[in-house]
A protein has these predicted regions:
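Peripheral docking tails and interdomain loops at the edges
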Residues: 97, 106-145, 149-157, 246-314, ...
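Gly-rich Lys/Arg/Thr-decorated short loops/hinges at beta-loop-alpha junctions or inter-strand turns
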Residues: 14-18, 72-73, 101-102, 155-158, ...
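ATP-dependent carboxylate activation and anion-phosphoryl transfer catalytic cores
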Residues: 265, 278-281, 392, 396-397, ...
Length: 690
């Protein structure tokens, strides 16, 4: 292990712990933390209470400061008012205490003064290389070392799920809920303000933690977007990462000036980043742990889904959910159908209904037969509490068959099923109570499996002279910028007079398109500053009309002329855009283009740089993909050319961080083999709009 990993290992497996702010007063944070540590068992050699007001607490000698303690201290837990924390951190540095949990609140979360105090904390940590969890956090738990360094009252069971939470209150609620649900954890970390240690530090540690099979996270933001994606990609090679992210709506977000800016926001950036990094996203506490529990025992489904039920209604619910989720309700092999026939079922095709009067053995036999089918990758076993069913016996069937093929039990009911449910939990098998929950959990497995296939593909690189391009960017030669990256554009020229417009049009050939060039006029079509299918006789008049309209909208000095462009007729219109996200960098968008992009909002998002798979997925994820693929006898569009533009534009956005927003709209794509053209574009850089 690296030095950082060794330090974090000591954080989770300390031999000696000091509680700064320990107190005999019941209900106080320092009292609860000390009690929890004392109740942790024999894992700790020494526990030190630190508080200058007392001589003894909980039978322990109480020290006035860390400096008075003889011997090593592996971990200090600080629970005192915020203003006293910097002084204690200096004591930690003097005593060689590398790992610190700052429970104390009153830092950046309370405003300006707290932010200054947190800056001081960070400065001390950097100067002395301290690992600090928090501040403003619940603490940490390592169930496999019997360590509970939190002020929570509930101790979770041991398990293989690590849980990182940015909210201490959320973590407390989850721990309490998990105790009732019998969900076990390996490690729990309340991240707090993430002043020093953030989610990435713990993800890197948990990647190598033998006690952890799955990482579940509750996040409000990420510290460094690109680093977060890089770390999660590495972790998710072997361990699923399930994230519940709060704030995933954009109500009240301000409209930005470009099409992309008005649609894209942090929600889209997070969702794109999660998909690209291999994260399985959950939208509720229930999903967070349903998905985590399922992924802790199933990470691949080798085939379609089978349903075996003793009740038609729940079976139909499961079948509907499977279709809606994009999973496959598999067709059985002929041999399976023949084996099922003697059981006299309501039906012997998928989903199998063994009927409400079926015995447990009949249900178990059907399960066993289906499990032998080569087309079946997982089975959803649904049981309602009918009179003939013995749930404990049914649970034994599930456990036996699960050893050969994944079985997802849906034992529906309350008190009647609880004995069997508890026994299943002891063997690491969760019950889902609701067929839809079971299907969603299998979809999470499939999503994880699919993302494993492509999450590690490196982005392609195109050779471009960026030095020359920067000079063109300075002179606002935007089309030249696209051209340099190999992005196809129509022939064009910039005209400052009507005669120049005619000369350019003669060279290009007719008809032509003509558009105003002004940083103040963004949506040119809306204000009549675009002329299409212009023939030779109309070039000069079109020039004058465009200029007149433009001068009504802005000053003459802000009009740079008129763009005269080869007229590209036909094709289907799409848009490629970019907005630079403050967490993740360039957020790319693809969708249905033209003037209706904001009406239909048929778009998909990814973070640059894109891999080939990312680019293809962006196109496939929009509803209009069927149109691009060809419908009602229409030829398929040249999707490969759009993939090429996405990849080249992705590299452009990465290499030019001063471009804040961009729209390539419309892009006209033609039938397969005939390519595409960027007909119009807009870019907003740190210094200009063009």
């Amino acid at each position: 292990m690296s030095t950082k990993e060794e330090m974090l290992d000591k954080l989770f497996n300390p031999r000696t712990v000091a509680v700064v702010g320990a107190t005999p007063k019941e209900g106080k944070v320092g009292n609860t933390i000390l009690k929890n540590l004392l109740a942790s068992g024999t894992g700790l050699l020494s526990i030190y209470a630190v508080n200058p007001r007392y001589d003894r607490i909980q039978g322990l000698k109480c020290y006035p400061s860390l400096s008075e303690i003889q011997g090593d201290i592996d971990l200090a837990v600080i629970a005192i008012p915020a203003e006293g924390v910097p002084n204690v951190l200096e004591q930690c540095a003097e005593r060689g205490v590398e790992n610190v949990v700052v429970i104390s609140a009153g830092f950046k979360e309370v405003g300006r003064e707290g932010a200054v105090l947190e800056s001081e904390l960070i400065k001390i940590a950097k100067e002395h290389k301290l690992n600090i969890v928090g501040p403003n956090c619940l603490g940490i738990i390592n169930t496999h070392a019997n360590l509970n360094a939190t002020f929570g009252k509930t101790v979770p069971d041991k398990g293989s799920i690590a849980f990182l939470s940015q909210s201490g209150a959320f973590a407390l609620a989850v721990i309490d809920w998990a105790k009732v649900a019998r969900v076990g954890f390996s490690k729990i970390v309340s991240l707090g303000n993430k002043a020093v240690l953030d989610e990435c530090h713990f993800l890197e540690y948990l990647d190598k933690d033998p006690d952890t099979a799955v990482v579940a996270m509750y996040l409000e933001d990420v510290s460094e977007g690109s680093r977060f994606m890089r770390v999660v990609r590495e972790v998710s090679r072997t361990k699923p990462v399930v994230v519940m992210k709060s704030g995933m709506t954009e109500a009240g977000a301000k409209a930005a000036s470009s099409h992309t800016g008005s649609i894209a926001g942090s929600v889209e950036a997070y969702r794109a980043a999660f998909a690209q990094a291999g994260i399985v996203e959950a939208t509720s506490i229930q999903e967070l742990f349903d998905f985590s529990l399922t992924l802790s025992r199933i990470q691949r489904i080798k085939g379609g889904i089978a349903i075996v039920t003793n009740s038609g209604g729940p079976g139909v619910m499961a079948a509907d959910a499977i279709e809606e989720s994009g999973l496959e309700l598999t067709a059985f092999e002929r041999e399976t159908m023949e084996k099922l026939h003697p059981l006299q079922l309501a039906n012997s095709y998928n989903p199998i209904d063994v009927r409400g009067d079926a015995t447990t053995d009949k249900f178990g036999t059907a399960l066993s037969i289906v499990a032998e089918d080569g087309y079946v990758g997982a089975i959803i076993a649904i049981l309602s509490p009918t009179a003939p069913i013995e749930f404990d016996k049914a649970g034994n069937y599930v456990m036996a068959i699960n050893a050969k093929k994944p079985v997802i039990p849906v034992f529906m009911g309350g008190e009647t099923v609880m004995s069997a449910v508890e026994e299943l939990k002891k063997h690491g098998i969760a019950n889902y109570f609701d067929p839809v929950r079971a299907v969603k959990s299998l979809k999470a497995v499939k999503d994880y499996e699919e993302r494993q296939k492509r999450v590690f593909e490196p982005p392609p690189h195109f050779n471009v002279d960026t030095g020359q391009i920067r000079e063109q960017l300075r002179h606002k030669l935007g089309f030249e910028l696209l051209k340099a990256y190999g992005i196809p554009i129509p022939a064009y020229g910039k005209a400052e007079t009507a005669d120049e417009a005619l000369d350019i049009a003669d060279k290009i050939g007719y008809p032509v398109a003509m558009k105003i060039l002004s940083p103040d006029i963004i949506h040119k079509t809306d204000v009549g500053c675009v002329k299409l299918n212009v023939n030779r006789e109309a070039v000069k008049e079109s020039f004058f009309e465009i200029m007149r309209r433009g001068e009504k909208l802005t000053t003459a000095r802000r009009i740079e002329g008129v763009l005269v462009q080869q007229m590209i007729a036909g094709g289907k219109e799409v848009i490629i855009g970019m907005k630079r996200d403050r967490h993740f960098g360039p957020l790319l968008m693809f969708g249905l283009g033209g003037i209706y992009v904001e009406v239909f909002r048929d778009v998909s998002f990814r973070i640059a740089p894109l891999s080939m798979s990312d680019a293809k997925e962006m196109i496939k994820n929009v509803r209009a993909y069927r149109i691009l693929h060809g419908v009602r006898g229409e030829p398929m569009s040249d999707i490969d050319s759009l993939v090429n533009v996405l990849l080249r534009f992705s590299q452009l956005c990465v290499e030019f961080p001063d471009i804040l927003e961009a729209d390539l709209n419309p892009i006209k794509v033609f039938e397969y083999g005939k390519g595409c053209y960027v007909v119009d574009f807009k870019m907003i850089s740190t210094n200009s709009v063009f």
